[in-house]
From Swiss-Prot:
The keyword Hydrolase applies. Belongs to the ComB family. Keywords: Hydrolase, Magnesium. This is Probable 2-phosphosulfolactate phosphatase. One of its GO terms (molecular function) is sulfopyruvate decarboxylase activity. Signal peptide: none annotated.
């Protein structure tokens, strides 16, 4: 198994992902939100690129009698007319269970849609990192960890999350790492902890300055969730893999 890392959404070559497994990360905060919403019983999450597309999709689903919630952000702030911002702590079970969540964010939902030509697209965060690693042990195709980044730029939080999952995967699977994948693994294994390492990251401090310290702490917590989620046909749902992940 070969493992590679893409450092931001701007570097995604959709055609080059054909035949590969893409593992999309937007640790702060889209993939943490998706992981949390589905764990708390959301029927599915539909990631879209634009705000206009989100409203159109919501209208379409509501016309079919579906319950819909809108979540997302622009410049880390809630979008006018949406039900939620991009804080995972808002997606509580009593609110999202059984409902469709349509999301649009600056970085994460864009990255997910750019990866749609991959053979499989897995949604990953620190929250379910060990579960993702365990799931990937059963794959033989090349795996590409796709860091969403921040506005097209490298983001150390996503890189750290990729390094963490790669490190977990290497414990039980013989893999071939590209230089950048080796670097991500090394950075994670040499650190004093995920949140401690990313405290100097630009995006981390944008969120901190908005008073979102609880989000940052939550998104940096390992293995709260033992489920794996796949983006397929425009929707994200829990993987029905039959694999029991013990955490």
């Amino acid at each position: 198994m070969k493992i590679d890392v893409i450092i931001s959404a701007d570097y995604i070559d959709s055609e080059a992902l054909k035949g590969k497994i893409a593992v999309v990360i937007d640790m702060l905060r889209a993939t943490s939100v998706i992981t949390t919403a589905l764990y708390n019983g959301a029927k599915k999450v539909i990631p879209v690129v634009s705000v206009e597309e989100a409203f159109e999709k919501a209208k379409e689903l509501k016309s079919l009698g579906e319950e819909v919630l809108l979540g997302g952000e622009r410049k880390a702030l809630k979008i006018d007319g949406f039900d939620f911002s991009n804080s995972p702590l808002e997606y509580k079970r009593e609110i999202v269970e059984g409902k469709n969540v349509i999301m649009s964010t600056t970085n994460g939902t864009r990255a997910l849609n750019l990866c749609s030509k991959a053979d499989k697209v897995i949604v990953a965060s620190v929250l379910n990192g060990q579960a993702v690693a365990k799931y990937l042990e059963n794959e033989e195709k090349e795996i590409v960890f796709v860091n969403s980044g921040t506005n097209g730029e490298f983001s150390s939080d996503d890189f750290m999350c990729a390094g963490y999952i790669i490190s977990e995967l290497c414990k039980n699977k013989e893999v071939e790492l590209t230089d950048i994948a080796k670097t991500a693994k090394y950075v994670y294994e040499s650190s004093e902890g995920i949140e401690e390492f990313i405290k100097d990251a630009k995006h981390y401090n944008i969120l901190k300055n908005l008073g979102l310290e609880e989000d940052l702490k939550y998104c940096s917590t390992k293995n709260l969730i033992d489920l794996v989620f796949e983006f397929k046909n425009g929707e994200i749902k829990t993987v029905e893999s039959g694999i029991k992940v013990k955490i």
